[in-house]
Amino acid sequence: MEPPVKINCPTCGRRFLSDETPAMPFCSKRCQLIDLGRWMNEEIGLPHEGDPGDAPVEYLDDRDLTQPSPERQNESFHRYSE
């Protein structure tokens, strides 16, 4: 087991030994829950720049599923029996 190290809590900044808390890397369960709340409220997050190839998602309604797409209208589908 590694010896404890002094670290700063990312929520409150308090300096503590790493073996003092089960809520690592936070100094307490309270600080851990404060951080979780910030993530859930989208106050903090990971930076992300969209890929230039990312396109908006188009959703189909049920009517779109009953007809083949224009690209596939000429394809024939076969069922194979076992």
Swiss-Prot record:
Tell whether Plastid is among the UniProt keywords: no
Function (record text): Inhibits all the catalytic activities of DNA gyrase by preventing its interaction with DNA. Acts by binding directly to the C-terminal domain of GyrB, which probably disrupts DNA binding by the gyrase.
- Cofactor descriptive note: Binds 1 zinc ion.
Q: What name is this protein filed under?
A: DNA gyrase inhibitor YacG
Stretches for region Disordered: 44-82
Keywords for this protein: Metal-binding, Zinc
State the oligomer form and interacting partners: Interacts with GyrB.
HAMAP family per UniProt: DNA_gyrase_inhibitor_YacG
Amino acids binding Zn(2+): 9, 12, 27, 31
Q: Where is the composition biased (Basic and acidic residues)?
A: 72-82
Q: What GO biological process terms does the UniProt entry carry, in alphabetical order?
A: regulation of DNA-templated transcription
User: Required co-factor?
Assistant: Zn(2+)
Gene that specifies this protein: yacG
What SUPFAM superfamilies does the annotation carry?
Answer: Glucocorticoid receptor-like (DNA-binding domain)
What's this protein's family per the entry? Belongs to the DNA gyrase inhibitor YacG family.
MF-aspect GO terms: DNA topoisomerase type II (double strand cut, ATP-hydrolyzing) inhibitor activity; zinc ion binding
For this protein, the record's Gene3D superfamilies field holds: Erythroid Transcription Factor GATA-1, subunit A
